[in-house]
UniProtKB/Swiss-Prot annotation:
Protein name: Cell death abnormality protein 2
Record's subunit section: Interacts with ced-5 (via C-terminus which contains a candidate SH3-binding, proline-rich region). Forms a ternary complex with ced-5 and ced-12. Interacts (via SH-2 domain) with src-1 (when activated and phosphorylated at 'Tyr-416').
UniProt GO MF annotations: protein-containing complex binding; receptor tyrosine kinase binding; signaling adaptor activity
Provenance organism: Caenorhabditis briggsae
Keyword terms of this UniProt record: Phagocytosis, Repeat, SH2 domain, SH3 domain
GO annotation, cellular component aspect: cytoplasm
Gene3D superfamilies, A to Z: SH2 domain, SH3 Domains
């Protein structure tokens, strides 16, 4: 069991792409938020991330650290925070679980709130790296409904990923209400509805509006993606690039073009340019 309260490899479960520096500061600066609580978000610098951390109780101090892409002379890519380089984000987070940033180390991730509890009606083994496999009868926590076909979910182990909406059924009754209540309470941390619930609903509304744009159109890549080298149907993309989206495929992915190359990209890796819609 992870004694420090988070799994570095599941960083997207505490990544809030639409959150501003001011909102993160307000959220983590709540008096009830403990020292070492953190989240990840997009930086104001395009294509980069920020790590926001509650570091002290005095003044409800929240610090923000820029995480930038780091490309070596040999072409290998990693990430850098200040002058320290790491092969990837999980390695960076793991490093600061045991070491102090300014005044605190990373102790507990600020998790996304639960909006619904579902149970698997069929077994789902997963087809892509972004999928979350589950068993028939397994309970899952829904974090966002990106579109009508695929939802972002979290299992009992804290692993997050995408699940097909037609493979699950909403769990009703006292158990579901208790789980949603606990998830909201933990994530908003006593902020009287002004915390993560607000950010989550704003993000979900934005994503739903983008779910069915008029194609073809352009979209911004939100995550680096290096697909299997033996699968030529997948498109390799880097965060910050602009791709031309050609069509939506039956599996929920998009067929896109980048620098003359055409391949498929998961919808969670792109954000449509609303100006083109």
């Amino acid at each position: 069991m992870n004694m420090n309260g988070f799994d570095p490899f599941e960083w997207r479960s505490f990544y809030f792409p639409g959150m501003s520096r001011e909102d993160a500061h307000k959220l983590l600066g709540e008096p009830r938020v403990s020292i070492g609580t953190f989240l990840m978000r997009d930086s104001s610098q395009p294509g980069e991330y920020s790590l926001s951390v509650r570091e002290a109780d005095e003044g409800n101090t929240v610090c923000h650290y820029l995480i930038v892409r780091d490309v070596k002379e040999d072409g290998t890519a990693g990430v850098k925070i200040a002058e320290q380089s790491f092969p990837d984000i999980p390695a960076l987070l793991n490093h600061f679980k045991m070491r102090v940033l300014t005044e605190a180390s990373l102790l507990s991730a600020y998790k996304k709130p639960i909006i619904e509890v579902v149970v698997g009606t069929f077994k789902f083994t997963g087809e892509r790296e972004t999928d979350l496999p589950f068993e028939q009868g397994e309970r899952l926590e829904i974090l966002s409904k990106t579109n009508n076909d695929w939802w972002e979910a979290r299992n009992a182990l804290g692993t997050t990923g995408l699940v097909p909406a037609n493979y699950v059924q909403v769990q009703s009754g006292e158990f579901a209400n208790e789980r949603i209540s606990k998830g909201t309470s933990q994530s908003s941390i006593g902020s009287s509805g002004n915390g993560a619930e607000r950010f989550s609903s704003t993000s979900t509304s934005s994503e739903n509006a983008e779910a069915h744009p008029t194609l073809p159109t352009t979209a911004k890549v939100t995550f680096d993606r290096v697909p299997n080298a033996y699968d030529p149907t997948q498109l390799r993309v880097k965060k910050g690039q602009t791709v031309r989206v050609l069509e939506k495929m039956s599996n929920g992915m998009y067929r896109a073009e980048l620098d003359g190359q055409i391949g498929s990209v998961p919808f969670t890796y792109i954000r449509f340019n609303t100006a083109n819609q």
